[in-house]
Amino acid sequence: MNVSFSIAPYFFKERRAKLNSFRKRKVEIVAEIDSLLKNSSSLAIVEYRGLTVNELEQLRKEFKSAGVLSKVYKNRLFKIAAENNGYLDLQTDLVGPNLFAFGTTDAIAPAKIIAKNAKEQPLLILKGGIYDNQVVSAAENALISALPSYTEALTMLASGLQSPLKQLAFGLKLLIDEQKITA
């Protein structure tokens, strides 16, 4: 009987130490999520239930090539970090297996990549997220994915400014060729 009492304190001490290490790791993960939420320009939450490992790896490769950080976190830990940063409305989207895509360089890139892949893989569901420090719904995230990226917008602007000048130059060249005006 005394033997069982002498083993018990050792067992509970070891178990308590293991639980403390798990708790420390969870605190570190919440701090990591906090940092990502503060430093990233956008966040898209994706449900990936039913995807194969190869499909998920391909999605992650696309994210990486676009400068998007993608990670899987426990929803409970993400809820804690979201509450710490004032994103209480995200809690409704934190159900099921979720992949969190943080836009670091281009704010629209996560939503664009997910929308493109969702056409090929219907099991990929774009949920809500954060854009411009505002919580957005799945519908708003879909609208954001339709927006042009920064470089695409600049290209559209440049071509819009260039088009009238090209038409003027072409018209003047035709008039010169027909010799209605002299150069």
From Swiss-Prot:
One of its GO terms (biological process) is translation. It comes from the Bacteria. GO terms for cellular component: ribonucleoprotein complex; ribosome. The keyword Ribonucleoprotein applies. CDD domains: Ribosomal_L10. Keywords: Ribonucleoprotein, Ribosomal protein, RNA-binding, rRNA-binding. GO terms for molecular function: large ribosomal subunit rRNA binding. Pfam families: Ribosomal_L10. Part of the ribosomal stalk of the 50S ribosomal subunit. The N-terminus interacts with L11 and the large rRNA to form the base of the stalk. The C-terminus forms an elongated spine to which L12 dimers bind in a sequential fashion forming a multimeric L10(L12)X complex. HAMAP family: Ribosomal_uL10. Forms part of the ribosomal stalk, playing a central role in the interaction of the ribosome with GTP-bound translation factors. PANTHER family: 39S RIBOSOMAL PROTEIN L10, MITOCHONDRIAL (PTHR11560). Belongs to the universal ribosomal protein uL10 family. This is Large ribosomal subunit protein uL10. It comes from Mesomycoplasma hyopneumoniae (strain J / ATCC 25934 / NCTC 10110).
